[in-house]
Amino acid sequence: MMKYFLVLCLVVLGVAAVQAAALEDEKFLNLAESLAMPEESRCKARRYGCTDKAECCSEKCAYPALTCAFNWSCEKVCA
């Protein structure tokens, strides 16, 4: 009975490891796609994850509703 429990634990851990690897691959693909875009489009595409204050406050990103306002309060940060 203990052998079955250990096998089940190994299977569950294996499935979790595969899912974690797939998630990392997805993040990498999203990053690669965003880097292939022109700078203005890339900035707008980061609306769900502004990388830093300089990007958030740059002129090309000066449209908080379209860019980084979801994670950064651009009006407050850039004031």
Curated annotation (Swiss-Prot):
Top-rank lineage group of the source organism: Eukaryota
Disulphide-bonded residues: 43-57, 50-61, 56-78, 68-74
Glycosylated residues (UniProt): 71
Tissues with expression: Expressed by the venom gland.
Entry's localization field: Secreted
Keywords from the UniProt entry: Disulfide bond, Glycoprotein, Ion channel impairing toxin, Knottin, Secreted, Signal, Toxin
GO molecular function list: ion channel regulator activity; toxin activity
Signal peptide limits: 1-20
Cellular-component GO terms for this entry: extracellular region
Annotated family: Belongs to the neurotoxin 13 (insecticidal toxin ABC) family. ICK-21 subfamily.
Free-text comment about domains: The presence of a 'disulfide through disulfide knot' structurally defines this protein as a knottin.
Record function comment: Ion channel inhibitor.
Protein name, per record: Toxin ICK-20
Source taxonomy: Eukaryota, Metazoa, Ecdysozoa, Arthropoda, Chelicerata
